[in-house]
UniProtKB/Swiss-Prot annotation:
Protein's name according to its UniProt entry: C1q-related factor
Species for this entry: Mus musculus (Mouse)
Keywords carried by this UniProt record: Collagen, Secreted, Signal
Subunit (UniProt): Interacts with ADGRB3. Forms heterooligomers with C1QL4, when proteins are coexpressed; this interaction does not occur after secretion.
Biased composition regions of type Low complexity, renumbered to the chain: 67-77
Main localization category: secreted
Distribution of this protein across tissues and organs: Expressed in brainstem. More abundant in areas of the nervous system involved in motor function, such as the Purkinje cells of the cerebellum, the accessory olivary nucleus, the pons and the red nucleus.
A molecular function (GO) term: signaling receptor binding
Cellular compartment(s): Secreted
Stretches assigned to the Collagen-like domain: 67-115
Region (Disordered): 39-120
Function of the protein: May regulate the number of excitatory synapses that are formed on hippocampus neurons. Has no effect on inhibitory synapses.
Signal peptide: 1-16
Positions of the C1q domain: 125-258
Amino acid sequence: MLLVLVVLIPVLVSSGGPDGHYEMLGTCRMVCDPYPARGPGAGARSDGGDALSEQSGAPPPSTLVQGPQGKPGRTGKPGPPGPPGDRGPPGPVGPPGEKGEPGKPGPPGLPGSGGSGAISTATYTTVPRVAFYAGLKNPHEGYEVLKFDDVVTNLGNNYDAASGKFTCNIPGTYFFTYHVLMRGGDGTSMWADLCKNGQVRASAIAQDADQNYDYASNSVILHLDAGDEVFIKLDGGKAHGGNSNKYSTFSGFIIYSD
């Protein structure tokens, strides 16, 4: 069928005569004359030919018309994860955390190697230095406070030789001891009491039986508060004074402070 059309089209065009509106352009292309014929003759053909020539020299009109801009499309799906980035710099130090719970007790430690048992010098410096020792020079009798006026030691200056009393300045536990020589020869006895604030805390007795002299002695450990007084008082009899021989003595010292 295509072969028949190719053969017939040139025959029809050539038989149309001078009034025909078809020409063969090339071998197979056919262009219609858009202008009507003006009349017979060469003039009409010439005008149509000029118009056809002008029409064929211009570019064909575009059949594409630009429409309005469309709406934005839908958001696409997320792409695949990218590769890991470079390691960033260290961040600032955070605030301190809350205090944790106490941990479990640890296992017992290994036995120590042991030492010589010597007391460190720090122990000596922490104990207050309070101590005194005094002897009785002059004889006493009756119910007097014995005034041991021959003072040998008085660390801390807590003992007063004029009154025969020890006054506590540092509360703590103290040790006191006394020895009083009785002056006899008349068959009497002697009692010597250690008193704290006037109350008897220890007593001693010496009796004149077959000899003229005898000793009364005792010792105590007392807790003292600041201002407490400790002294030795006769409760009858005679106490012998030894000049500088210290036959009768009174002493004491602090064991430890409060």
